[in-house]
């Protein structure tokens, strides 16, 4: 992801290093297959596509937790509301904020902010529906859209530590301290209705 050259013509982009998480990796694979085999326009009157997507890799999750001193949450018993409040009031890394500012300039639709965790890579333990997804409306004000987007990203990060997520991770014999979260930002597809 290059803040100087990114445009809405880019169908799938990655911000940062580290894992894409299971969901994003699957979407990237499907996108490459659609392009490679020209399936997106192969059938008359049918358009197959993956919504324009940007993935925030796990590097930024690690940075966010470390720079805001949030690791203590792993060993504490806070309510979901307390965790969400702590995360939303924390600051995302500058480089990520700048990349998202560049991205938001190209957005003209509502957005889905989706989880894509490292544990979603598991072949034997499904994690579908465990973490949060947030929908944000399109607002014709870049600053307001950016604020909504930043809050949604932090909220997805917080969902790693919610009670239901913790319980599921423990039941799957995984460790909460080893979980890492990537975030998928996707345009919402559809037709506006009156």
Language-model features: locations:
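Terminal amphipathic helices with adjacent charged low-complexity linkers/tails
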Residues: 50-77
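Metal-assisted phosphate- and nucleotidyl-transfer catalytic regions
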Residues: 81-95
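Conserved mixed alpha/beta core segments that line enzyme active sites in large multi-domain catalysts
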Residues: 1-42, 91-194
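Short N-terminal secondary-structure initiator segments
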Residues: 1-15, 67-84
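An N-terminal structural lobe/cap that precedes and organizes the functional/catalytic core
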Residues: 40-50, 54
